[in-house]
Each structure stands twice: as structure tokens, then as C-alpha cells.
């Protein structure tokens, strides 16, 4: 399960700049004994202290030294988890992954013996929904930054509270700089008689050891700059409830003038200016205003569409120009920026909320809370004195809300409700009851809407007792690490026979930053980059978002076809080479990054996409829906097979409009970048792009229709194939509705208010219609009435097995045989011989020949004592391979990984070696038609990511089906699965070799053949 959205930022990194040697001077150190005592005495403790006081790094260590391990610490964001874990491990002279570990997303750096574990709130939530109380096998759980009210954080809090009722030994520590103490005390007061939330306040440090922060408001800024005392141009309205939040040109000019004023008055060029603006567009506006001053300023951008870690890494202290950082609220508490002396706060923020009229998430500009403003103030005054400029009047500021509304009150909660209903723990699997117990319960109507929608798409069903229970489809959706809409899209692509294309599109829908580089402030250049990968924008339906999504889809395929396939081939060549190029392996990451830069794509984004892709695919292999059995994994990047790309590299001026700091400091000439000019990188309609784009547009329209309840829908409606058909009636004239149609009786549209309005083409697109209920066009989704419910959209694979699928793979002509790989006791070979001529069976075993007697195998050629992969697939140097590979048409391996290795990593290595050596044999001898059938437990197949291992050696999954144990031998590798609707059974996976193009990579087969037969 995955409820959390993929973000890569930090919140507790605010305390990170302190080196280990400075820990002794932290304000929290004097409170060590008191903190330990209070946590021992109380089940819930709230620790309140200013940013930088040492809460995040020191409290876990206090508890460890008091023998209270294991200890779990949560952070709201991934970057913070890694950063704090590294700092704590370093301070304890411990290797990360040993005593101190962490878990973010798919990355686990920990052992069973780890004593302090750092995780995101989303990871902990997933574990609680998956394992219930068993996920909390810790002595203490620390929930850090509880003031950051994400949906995940609020759900973690309510789940932990429910489990506290069941486990009296559990200790919970809440930590924050700005938490509302009274609210948390009230929230936990029902734990038990005589229990209460104990509050430990960390005193502020000695004033001599901290730097001063001066706060100025709009009226003071106006005085400094000598502008008009009429402040309405910058803050139109006396209070937040009436004032417009729009960032007007006058405010941008004021910010610009303030930056120049600070630069003029501050002699220390190393002191930076941080500007908070709410949107990408407002960042762009200020960026363009600063362009004429790039000789004086080095401008950096912090926005979620830009890789935050790379942006921070680029922020070196510049001694010749002042650093100006333009940032959204990602910089409030997510990052630590060195040498920030000035903060300019627009006091606006972009808020995501559920728009019921558009039936999708939307955004709006809002005034920040005073708590948010304090977080922004905390960005300065750490290493030097700081000044904060709040661009609202002081009286206005005092009327701002104290805290921002929690996310749980602003979203549709569809995905969260589904995940709650999927958990097995009765304490937390009733969505209505659990959400009503949240610190800020959402509107019951919102929860009911979510439940109704999940019922309508048959992700949930109602039990006879009225409980909401997940269907197979619902559990499958909840298992993906994707957003709700992306999860539905993936399944629908699977039903169309394009599962892997759908997974890639679904992952890209949820990914920021996307792989194709978006030069900040230069949208035309970005669209040029997009056009290099997808030129079908004029032939597909949908808007800009669909076009950009398809371009990134093609960019990923291009990376796989041109770069990854090349290095997969190099790996195979190196495998048998006597002189292995060790430097190539070490240099590979840099080579790949350079290649990506040549083609305006981001290496880090590709790896993020790949990780989510494999995780989503693994869920399908665990659940095995009906359509997976015939799902062919041959990638679309092999269409056309003749695809060819040759890089032509030219030096071009850097797209950065300012010089890099190191170039200026060292008096270097203006930087140039090397780019591939062999464009377009992907020709029109390569990789089946247009067909996939049309399918995507159609599926998005269907999803929008499904998830939009019709006013006349009684719960028994089914979608019309064309939901905008007007049944011969002319639609209403939208100009008539607006009062300015000048065609009168000549108009071909109807001028009556009773007529049907034409459909809004934007409403059914991925971005939706921005006009909501005020749109002149219709947002109604037509349905036809039926007297029955349609069948469930996604059913599990049928349990029955048959001999036919496997026997159909065996050669039927007089020539050709099958090879049973490493059948130690001939168990499977004997069973196959009962169904297939024994004289056409080859069988190998790593066991030595014994007194083996089976009359059914009298004509079978058995090769004893052959080890894997050498001897069986490829013989050692100077030895002839005993297997007559020219006769083999099908290779079968009945694999129990535990019989080969005792750890998953070693088992992966066994499988990797198998596919690599098979690829060398089949490519070198041009035996492309040989099929490889791997039979193993599907859960192990998923956990070991076997499909990925095969793909790295050009083997692609063609089909899969249940193993017929009665006909072909009982399979010993069984895994007991406790979770409902998950499958655990032996499956036969059929892999086909798809050789890479010799047009793209030259005559590689002769090199492999030479290596193969010269050994």
C-alpha cells in the first residue's frame, strides 16, 4: 500500500547545520534527564522547542541511552528522514544501516538489529494499515513536526491513538516548534483515567549564542523604499477575509525594489536573500525582472517541479555576486539554505483543495497562517543576524489564522478511505468511525461521497451487515504506490492489453520533476524539448498536459532503447571477456548523466520513475488479475525495430542566463554545454506513441465520467460508449446563453434554455475545466439506465490449471526438443515424460549420477553433474558444451530459490546469472526462437523482481499461467499469505528473447559468438 505522495524534501533539516561537536551546547542537552523521566512516566509526551534546539537529533539518542530501544522516529518528508538519520549515525560513530536505519519509499537502509529507525509518516501509515498493531513493535514512537498537518500525519496520529487504547506499554512522543499544546492535550485526554499529555518545553538558548531576527511589515518597507503610503496596491483589503491574494505587478515591483535596496545597503556579498512567492508563474515574473541584474545576482529557484537536492547542491557561496533564492513554500521548513540573512515574505501560499464542481483537485491562492510565517522567519538568523520583510501591514498580519487548515479538511479522501477499508485491523478499518476521531474530523458528507464513488466503481462493496469491504479491484488499486486516478488508469490499460505502457504513464502522471528538462523562465525552449520526443501534439485529443506526458513517455522509451540497451549489451560482452573493463562500471553513472544532459533529460527522474514502475508491476504479479496471464511485456520501444539514433554533439551557449559562480570567481569564459543536435530524438509515431496517446485520452475521459456521479443516476447506471450523444437534438447556443448571439434565426444551434448544452471538452481531460460550475458548456455525463450492475471491472485470475498452455509451447515437429534445467531428482522430467515423448526431452542436474531407475525416462538424454550457469549454458574455457543447443526449442526451469541461496540478494544473483548466460548463448548462436519457461511461486517472482532481471538481458515476459501440479509435478516452494485476495501459487512464466537492433548497435552477435566459442 502507498498513501503518501512522492516528495523529496525535509522538514527537520532545520537543525542540520550544527556539527557533532556543537551538540553539547544545544538547549535540549540540559533537559535530558527531565525528558527521559517524563517519557517513562507518561504514555504521551509533547516536546515543544524552537527550530534548531536539537529535538530531532537528540531525543532519540536520549531514549537509546536509557535502554528504551527500539525507537521509531517519523518525519513529514523524505529528505528529512535521510538527513537526520545520517546526522545521528555520524554523531554516534555508527554506519548508517546498522544501529541507525531509515526507510523512505522503496529504500530501506536498516537491519533487524537497528535500534533507531527513521521513517516518513507515509511509510508508517502504510505499515499500520497493512499490519495493524504489529507495525508498532517499538518501545517509543516519536512523531516529529506534528504541526505539519498532512493527511498522512493526521491519519498516523489517529491510528496511533487507537492502538494506544490496546497497548498500555506503548510510548508516544510528539515534537514541534509551533504545536497548539491545548489541542493535543484535549485530543489524548480520553486515553485513560488519570492519564494526560505531559508537556516539556525546551527553553530558548542564551541570547548571546543566537543571532537577532528583525521583522518589518509593509508600512515599514514602504517607508524604507520611499513609496506611496497607500498600501492598497500591495495588500488590497483591511483583513485576510476580504483582501485579494493576487500577486499584482505593483507587488512584484515592490519585491524587486526591496531586493535592490538590500543589495545596496548590505556590504557582505555572501549574505543571501530568500524570497517567498506562491506560484511558479510568480517566481517566473520576479526572475524576469531580475534578468538585467544577473551581473550582480546569482538567482536560484526552489519549486517542486525542479529537483530540490540538485538545486541546493548548486547553491555554493558566491564571493562575486549575491545569491537570491526565489522559492515557494517548499523552503519553509523543507530545506536548509546556508547564509540566508534576508527573507522577503509575500505572505501568500498556493493551497490544494478538492473542487466538488470539477470533481478533481484544484488550487487557490490563500493567505498564510501566522505559524507558516514563523516557519519562514526561521529560515534566517542562524549563522548571522537576519531581517524578515512581511509584505502585509502589521495589523493585517495579526488577523491571519494562527494555523493553516489541515489537509484532511481540503481533499476528497477517496484514496485514504479506500486504504482504510482495506486494512485488516478492526480498530482502524471503518472509514467513517476512524476519520470522525481525527483531530480535525472531515465533513461526513465528504467521506460519504468518497464511499459512494468507491462503491460505484466497485472498488468497495457493502456486506450484509452494512460494512464497506474492499473488492479484489479495490485491494489491487490500494496496493499501488500511485495516486487514485493514476491507479485506475493503470488497470484500464491492463484490461486493454497494454499493462506496462499504462504503468509507465501512471507513474509519470505522479512524477515531479518529470524527466524532460524544463528550463526555468523559458517555456518556448521547454516546448522545443518536448517536441523532440513527441511530435503528435496536433493529432491527439487532450491538452498540453497530455502532450507533455506523452513526450516524457517517449523520452523514457528512448533512454531504454538507445542508452540502456547499449550498456546491457556491453555488460554481456564484458561477462565473457578475459580483460574486463573495471573502469567502465565505475564511470557508468557519470557516462549516463552526461548522455542524459546531451538529450535534455534528467537521470535522477528516470531512476525515480523506474523504481515506482517496478513496485507497481510487482503488485500485479502478487494479485494476478485476469488480464495478466496474456499480458505481453515486449516494450513499445521495439516498434519500429529499425529505430536508429546516432548522436551528433555540438557545443552551445549555456541556457542559464547567468554565469555559474565558480566561473565568475575564477575569471573563466562563459560556460558552454554539449548537446545532441540529431533531432527529433523520437520520430513521429515511433514507439506506438499516437495509439497510446489516443488510448490515454479515451481512458482519462472514461475515468472522469466514472468518477462524476450523474444527478439522475440511481446507482444502476452504465456508461454510454459516447457519453456526449445528443440524440438528434441541436445543442443550445452558448453565445445565446451569454446574451450575444448575432445570428438570430439563422443560428444552427437552439435558442431555448431547455435545450442540452454542448459538452465541455476540457472537463473530460486530465486537467479538467477551470471554470467549474460557471462553465457555459455541459459537465453532465450521460448514462444509460440498465436493470443490472455491470460485472466487476477487474477480476482475479481463475484458480484452475491446465496442461494445454505448457504443452502448446513444446515443439511438435520431428525436429526439436525441450531442455529441463537443473532437475536434481528428475521429479519434473518424469512428470513431463508422461505427457510428452521422452526421447524429445533433455534434462540436466547438478547432482552426480546415481542409481536412478525410471523406465519412462529410458529414452531421455540426462546430463548429470552440470553446474549452473557454467557447464549447462556455457562451458568453461577449453571445454565443449554437452548440450545440443541447436536442437533445443524450449528451456524449462522449475525454481525453488531457497534451494540455491538463503537470502533474496543471493537469489537475485542466481537469476541474473541465468538470464545473462542464456542471453549470451541465444544471441551468440542466433537461437532467437527458444522460449524460456521459468516456473516459480508468484510471490517470490514479485519480491525478487524477476521480470526486471530478465529485461536486463533482453528477455521479455510473453505470457504466464498457473502451473499444473497434477500433470507436471508438485511444486515444493509454497509461501503462506495471510492477506485476503493475494495469490500464492506456482506460476509458469514464458520469456521471449527480443534481440536489440543491429542497426542501432552494429554486428554485436559475431562478437558474442566469438567470445562464446573461444572460451
From Swiss-Prot:
User: InterPro entries per the record?
Assistant: DEAD/DEAH_box_helicase_dom, Helicase_ATP-bd, Helicase_C-like, P-loop_NTPase, Znf_CCCH, Znf_CCCH_sf
Keyword field contains RNA-binding: yes
Ranges in coiled-coil conformation: none
Q: Which Pfam families match?
A: DEAD (PF00270), Helicase_C (PF00271)
Q: Which reaction does it catalyse?
A: ATP + H2O = ADP + phosphate + H(+)
> Zinc finger spans (C3H1-type)?
727-753, 754-782
Q: Where is this motif: DEVH box?
A: 144-147
What positions does the domain Helicase C-terminal occupy? 254-419
Task: Please state what class of enzyme this protein is.
Answer: hydrolase
Q: What keywords are annotated for this sequence in UniProt? A: ATP-binding, DNA-binding, Helicase, Hydrolase, Metal-binding, Nucleotide-binding, Repeat, RNA-binding, Zinc, Zinc-finger
The similarity annotation says: Belongs to the DExH box helicase family.
Name the UniProt record assigns to this protein = DExH-box ATP-dependent RNA helicase DExH8
Amino acid at each position: 500500500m502507498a498513501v503518501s505522495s512522492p516528495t523529496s524534501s525535509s522538514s527537520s533539516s532545520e537543525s542540520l547545520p550544527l556539527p557533532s561537536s556543537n551538540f553539547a551546547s544545544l538547549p535540549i542537552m540540559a533537559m535530558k534527564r527531565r525528558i527521559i523521566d517524563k517519557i517513562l512516566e507518561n504514555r504521551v509526551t509533547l516536546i515543544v522547542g524552537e527550530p534548531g534546539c536539537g529535538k530531532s537529533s537528540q531525543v532519540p539518542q536520549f531514549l537509546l541511552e536509557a535502554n528504551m530501544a527500539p525507537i521509531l522516529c517519523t518525519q513529514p518528508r523524505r529528505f528529512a528522514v535521510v538527513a537526520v538519520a545520517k546526522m545521528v549515525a555520524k554523531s554516534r560513530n555508527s554506519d548508517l544501516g546498522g544501529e541507525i536505519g531509515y526507510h523512505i519509499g522503496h529504500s530501506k537502509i536498516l537491519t533487524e538489529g537497528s535500534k533507531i529507525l527513521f521513517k516518513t509518516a507515509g511509510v508508517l501509515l502504510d505499515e499500520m494499515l497493512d499490519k495493524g498493531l504489529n507495525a508498532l513493535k517499538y518501545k517509543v514512537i516519536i512523531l516529529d513536526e506534528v504541526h505539519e498537518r498532512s493527511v498522512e500525519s493526521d491519519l498516523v496520529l489517529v491510528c496511533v491513538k487507537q492502538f494506544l487504547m490496546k497497548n498500555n506499554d506503548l510510548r508516544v512522543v510528539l515534537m514541534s516548534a509551533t504545536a497548539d499544546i491545548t489541542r493535543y492535550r484535549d485530543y489524548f485526554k480520553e486515553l485513560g483515567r488519570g492519564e494526560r499529555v505531559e508537556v516539556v518545553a525546551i527553553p530558548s538558548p542564551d541570547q548571546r549564542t543566537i543571532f537577532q531576527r528583525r521583522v518589518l511589515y509593509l508600512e515599514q518597507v514602504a517607508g524604507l523604499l520611499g513609496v506611496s503610503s497607500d498600501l492598497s496596491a500591495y495588500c488590497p483589503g483591511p483583513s485576510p477575509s476580504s483582501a485579494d491574494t493576487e500577486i499584482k505587478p505593483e507587488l512584484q515591483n515592490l519585491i524587486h525594489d526591496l531586493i535592490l535596496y538590500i543589495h545596496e545597503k548590505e556590504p557582505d556579498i555572501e549574505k543571501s536573500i530568500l524570497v517567498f512567492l506562491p506560484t511558479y508563474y510568480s517566481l517566473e515574473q520576479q526572475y524576469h525582472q531580475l534578468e538585467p541584474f544577473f551581473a550582480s545576482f546569482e538567482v536560484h529557484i526552489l519549486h517542486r517541479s525542479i529537483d530540490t537536492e540538485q538545486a541546493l547542491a548548486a547553491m555554493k557561496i558566491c564571493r562575486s555576486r549575491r545569491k537570491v533564492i526565489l522559492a515557494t513554500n517548499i523552503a519553509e521548513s523543507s530545506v536548509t539554505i546556508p547564509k540566508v540573512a534576508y527573507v522577503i515574505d509575500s505572505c501568500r501560499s498556493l493551497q490544494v483543495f478538492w473542487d466538488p464542481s470539477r470533481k478533481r483537485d484544484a488550487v487557490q491562492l490563500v493567505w498564510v497562517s501566522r505559524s507558516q510565517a514563523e516557519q519562514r522567519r526561521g529560515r534566517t538568523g542562524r549563522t548571522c543576524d537576519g531581517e524578515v520583510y512581511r509584505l502585509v501591514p502589521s495589523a493585517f498580519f495579526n488577523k491571519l489564522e494562527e494555523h493553516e487548515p489541515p489537509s484532511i479538511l481540503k481533499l476528497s479522501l477517496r484514496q485514504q478511505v479506500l486504504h482504510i477499508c482495506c486494512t485488516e485491523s478492526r480498530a482502524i478499518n471503518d472509514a467513517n468511525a476512524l476519520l470522525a476521531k481525527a483531530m480535525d474530523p472531515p465533513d461526513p458528507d465528504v467521506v460519504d461521497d468518497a464511499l459512494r464513488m468507491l462503491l460505484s466503481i466497485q472498488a468497495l462493496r457493502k456486506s450484509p451487515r452494512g460494512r464497506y469491504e474492499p473488492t479484489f479491484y479495490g485491494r489491487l488499486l490500494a496496493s499501488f504506490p500511485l495516486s487514485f486516478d493514476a491507479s485506475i488508469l493503470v488497470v484500464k490499460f491492463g484490461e486493454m492489453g497494454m499493462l506496462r505502457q499504462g504503468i509507465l504513464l501512471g507513474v509519470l502522471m505522479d512524477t515531479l520533476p518529470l524527466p524532460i528538462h524544463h528550463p526555468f523562465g523559458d517555456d518556448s525552449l521547454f516546448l522545443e524539448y518536448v517536441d523532440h520526443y513527441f511530435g503528435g501534439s496536433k493529432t491527439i485529443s487532450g491538452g498540453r498536459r497530455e502532450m507533455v506526458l506523452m513526450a516524457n513517455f517517449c523520452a523514457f522509451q528512448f533512454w531504454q532503447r538507445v542508452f540502456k540497451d547499449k550498456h546491457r549489451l556491453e555488460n554481456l560482452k564484458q561477462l565473457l571477456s578475459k580483460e574486463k573493463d573495471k573502469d567502465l562500471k565505475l564511470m557508468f553513472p557519470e557516462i549516463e548523466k552526461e548522455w542524459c544532459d546531451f538529450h535534455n533529460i534528467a537521470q535522477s527522474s528516470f531512476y525515480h520513475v523506474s523504481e515506482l514502475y517496478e513496485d507497481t508491476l510487482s503488485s500485479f504479479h502478487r494479485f494476478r488479475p485476469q488480464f495478466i496471464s496474456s499480458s505481453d511485456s515486449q516494450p513499445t520501444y521495439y516498434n519500429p525495430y529499425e529505430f536508429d539514433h546516432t548522436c551528433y554533439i555540438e557545443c552551445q551557449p549555456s541556457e542559464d542566463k547567468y554565469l555559474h559562480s565558480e566561473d565568475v570567481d575564477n575569471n573563466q569564459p562563459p560556460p558552454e554545454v554539449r548537446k545532441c543536435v540529431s533531432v527529433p530524438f523520437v520520430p513521429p509515431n515511433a514507439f506506438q506513441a499516437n495509439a497510446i496517446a489516443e488510448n490515454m485520452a479515451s481512458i482519462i475521459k472514461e475515468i472522469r465520467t466514472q468518477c462524476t456521479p450523474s444527478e439522475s443516476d440511481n446507482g444502476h447506471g452504465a456508461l454510454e460508449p459516447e457519453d456526449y450523444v445528443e440524440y438528434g437534438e441541436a445543442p443550445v447556443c452558448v453565445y445565446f446563453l451569454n446574451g450575444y448571439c448575432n445570428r438570430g434565426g439563422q443560428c444552427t444551434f437552439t435558442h431555448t434554455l431547455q435545450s442540452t448544452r454542448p459538452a465541455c471538452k476540457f472537463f473530460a481531460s486530465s486537467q479538467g475545466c477551470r471554470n467549474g460550475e460557471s462553465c457555459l458548456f455541459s459537465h453532465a455525463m450521460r448514462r444509460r439506465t440498465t436493470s443490472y450492475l455491470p460485472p466487476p471491472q477487474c477480476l482475479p485470475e481463475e484458480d484452475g490449471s491446465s496442461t494445454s498452455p505448457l504443452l502448446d509451447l513444446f515443439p511438435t515437429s520431428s525436429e526439436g526438443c525441450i531442455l529441463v534445467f537443473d532437475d536434481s531428482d528428475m521429479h519434473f522430467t518424469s512428470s513431463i515424460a508422461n505427457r510428452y515423448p521422452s526421447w524429445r526431452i533433455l534434462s540436466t542436474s547438478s547432482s552426480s549420477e546415481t542409481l536412478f531407475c525410471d523406465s519412462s525416462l529410458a529414452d531421455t538424454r540426462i546430463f548429470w553433474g552440470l553446474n549452473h550457469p557454467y557447464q549447462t549454458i556455457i562451458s568453461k574455457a577449453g571445454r565443449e558444451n554437452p548440450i545440443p543447443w541447436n536442437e533445443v526449442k524450449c528451456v524449462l526451469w522449475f525454481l525453488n530459490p531457497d534451494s540455491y541461496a538463503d537470502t533474496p540478494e543471493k537469489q537475485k544473483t542466481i537469476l541474473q546469472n541465468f538470464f545473462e548466460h542464456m542471453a549470451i548463448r541465444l544471441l551468440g548462436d542466433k537461437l532467437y526462437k527458444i522460449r524460456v519457461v521459468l516456473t516459480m511461486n508468484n510471490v517470490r517472482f514479485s519480491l525478487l523482481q524477476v521480470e526486471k532481471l530478465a529485461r536486463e538481458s533482453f528477455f521479455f515476459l510473453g505470457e504466464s499461467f498457473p502451473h499444473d501440479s497434477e500433470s507436471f509435478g508438485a511444486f515444493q516452494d509454497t509461501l503462506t499469505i495471510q492477506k485476503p485476495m493475494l495469490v500464492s501459487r506456482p506460476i509458469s512464466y514464458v520469456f521471449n528473447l527480443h534481440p536489440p537492433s543491429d542497426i542501432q548497435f552494429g554486428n554485436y552477435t559475431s562478437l558474442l559468438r566469438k567470445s562464446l566459442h573461444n572460451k
